[in-house]
Amino acid sequence: MMLGPEGGEGFVVKLRGLPWSCSVEDVQNFLSDCTIHDGAAGVHFIYTREGRQSGEAFVELGSEDDVKMALKKDRESMGHRYIEVFKSHRTEMDWVLKHSGPNSADSANDGFVRLRGLPFGCTKEEIVQFFSGLEIVPNGITLPVDPEGKITGEAFVQFASQELAEKALGKHKERIGHRYIEVFKSSQEEVRSYSDPPLKFMSVQRPGPYDRPGTARRYIGIVKQAGLERMRPSAYSTGYGGYEEYSGLSDGYGFTTDLFGRDLSYCLSGMYDHRYGDSEFTVQSTTGHCVHMRGLPYKATENDIYNFFSPLNPVRVHIEIGPDGRVTGEADVEFATHEEAVAAMSKDRANMQHRYIELFLNSTTGASNGAYSSQVMQGMGVSSAQATYSGLESQSVSGCYGAGYSGQNSMGGYD
C-alpha cells in the first residue's frame, strides 16, 4: 500500500505527450475527475536544458483511488494530442525534477524566465506591465542585442523568488501589443551564456525603475577626421538619438582638444588618466572615486561585479569593450565616496569565478565630480543655454569605445 504524500512515495502519475503550450489549468482539466494534491502546486512540468517544456509532467494526487482514475485517462486526448498516463512515485519525480531543466542540480533556482517574440521597440516598462503583480528584482530585466546592436526579440527577467517565476510561466502565449509572447524557464547560467562575445547585454532605452544607476549607456566608436575627433555610432551604439555626435576627446598624447582642436586640458579637472601596463585610456568619473579592474573573466557581467564588491554598492560599472567588439577583461567601477573606493581595494587579488582580479585605486579625498561648468562650455563656443551640461561618462582612446548616454544633437550628455 502506498503511503500518503506527507510520509512516503505519495500518489504520483506521470503524463507524456503534452502540448508544448500546455498549462497547469490544462492538466487540471484533463484530470478533472481526480483530486490533485495542493491544487496547481501539485502539477510539475519537466523542462529541457533550454527551459522549454519537454511534453511530460508529474502530478501529485490525493489518494490511491485518484491514481486509478488518472490511469483510466491513458490515451485520451488533450487538444489534438494523445496523452499517456503512467504510475510513478515521489522518488522518481524528485530525481527527474532535480536533474532536468536549466535549474537542475548544478544551477540555482534563481527565478529567471526567458521571453521570446517581443515586439520591436519593446521597453522594460512594458515587460513589467506584462508581469503585473509579480515582483521583479531591481535591474532584473535584460534585453540582449545582436552584434549590430539590434534587439533580438528576447529578454531575460529575474523574479524575487522561484515561485514567482513559476507563476510567470502562466503568461506563456499572452500578448504584448499584437505579438504573442513565449515564456520559458531560464537560469543565471543561460543569461551568462548570452554575454559571450560577440553578444553583449546593453540597455537600449532610457533607464527605468528596474535599472541600476548608470546602466543606460551607449558604446560609441571614435574616428579622427580633419583635425577633430568625430564620434559615430558603432555596432553597439543602440541608444536613441541616431545622429552623429561630436565631442572633444583626448588625442592619446595627454592633450585634450575640443571640436576645433583647441586644448581643453585646463578645464577637465574631473578627468584622470589610466595607465595599467599596456592599457591607456581616459575616463571621466561622475564621482571622482574609481577603482579599475583587470583580469575579469570574459563572461563577467555587471551583476558579477556588483556582487564582487558586496556589501559595498558601486554607483556605476563600465565594462570595457575593444575595437573588435570583444570585452577586454577590464572595467571601471565608481563609488560614491573616497572611503568606499579605498574599502573596495580590500578585494585586490580576490577571485571572480576562476580568475583573480587586480584592482587599481584612482580616487582622492575631495575629488571633483568632473562636471563641466557653464563658463568652460561657453569657452568652447557653445551658447549659454547649451552650456547646461554635465555627465560625459567615459571616453576611451586605446579601446576605441566611450560610454555616453545622450539625446539628439547633444555633445555626450543629456539634452
Curated annotation (Swiss-Prot):
Pfam families: RRM_1, zf-RNPHF. GO terms for cellular component: nucleoplasm; spliceosomal complex. The modification N-acetylmethionine is found at M1, M2. Keywords: Acetylation, Isopeptide bond, mRNA processing, mRNA splicing, Nucleus, Phosphoprotein, Repeat, Ribonucleoprotein, RNA-binding, Spliceosome, Ubl conjugation. Residues 13-85, 111-188, 289-366 form the RRM domain. Gene3D superfamilies: 3.30.70.330. The record marks R16, W20, R52, R75, R116, F120, K150, K173, R294, Y298, R326, R349 as: Interaction with RNA. There is a cross-link at K72 (Glycyl lysine isopeptide (Lys-Gly) (interchain with G-Cter in SUMO)). Residues 81-86, 179-184, 355-360 are annotated as: Interaction with RNA. The modification Phosphoserine is found at S104, S107, S161, S187, S193, S195, S265. Sumoylated. Identified in the spliceosome C complex. Interacts with AGO1, AGO2, TBP and TXNL4/DIM1. The N-terminal RRM domains are responsible for recognizing the G-tract of BCL-X RNA. This is Heterogeneous nuclear ribonucleoprotein F.
